[in-house]
Amino acid sequence: MSCELVTTGWFASDQPRNYRTAGDDAIRGVGFRPVWWQSVDTFLAPRHVLVVDSASPVKAKESEFTATPVERIELLMNPGHSQNGTTHYCGAMAAIMLSMEYALFNDVDLFLYVEQDALIHGKAILDRTKNALRRRDLVFGRGDMDIQQSFFAANKKGLRRFLSALHSINYSDKQIAPEY
């Protein structure tokens, strides 16, 4: 079983970070990309992938790792991390929101977002996600963190509702970080 579209964000830099992160920086760089693609191609088998690039100084050459068609949208500037961003939305939220709109404009029935540092595993993950979306409009992963946005899915109704709610938040991501 395959899906029509997987979306993700992208930012990589050789410079030290000026914000707090969890995990090894190796998962945020080009060196991790072949592993990411192997998990996405093996367990989701998308017909298309959208990468929203936050004006990253280091680019991944996606075609070196996959035969899946990739569309890339590059932001004019890096919105930054929620801890130090200067715009209303941080880079992660820009990637999520732009890819949601992209999915709606392309009439995609199943929206899947996989963060650039997340691995997907399990032959039944796509079927289980589709089944869950028959009961709910949004499906998020499970784990130790309060918020699980590394992998999530939505149907069209869920996309419209979620985008509407996100756009109604008057506080910037720096004021109220989306991770918390």
Report the location of each language-model feature.
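N-proximal low-complexity "stem/linker" segments adjacent to membrane-targeting elements
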Residues: 1-35
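Short loop->beta transition adjacent to catalytic acidic/histidine clusters or analogous donor-positioning motifs
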Residues: 3, 41-50, 70
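Short, solvent-exposed loop/turn segments at secondary-structure junctions
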Residues: 11-15, 55-58, 78-81, 116-120, ...
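Active-site-proximal specificity loops/subdomain of glycosyltransferases
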Residues: 16-22, 52-106
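Conserved donor NDP-sugar-binding/catalytic core segment of glycosyltransferases
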Residues: 106, 130-141, 145
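Short beta-strand-to-loop acidic/aromatic patch adjacent to the donor-nucleotide binding site
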Residues: 107-119
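Acidic donor-binding/catalytic loop of UDP-sugar-dependent glycosyltransferases
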Residues: 116-130
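Catalytic core and acceptor-binding pocket of nucleotide-sugar-dependent glycosyltransferases
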Residues: 120-123, 141-145, 149-180
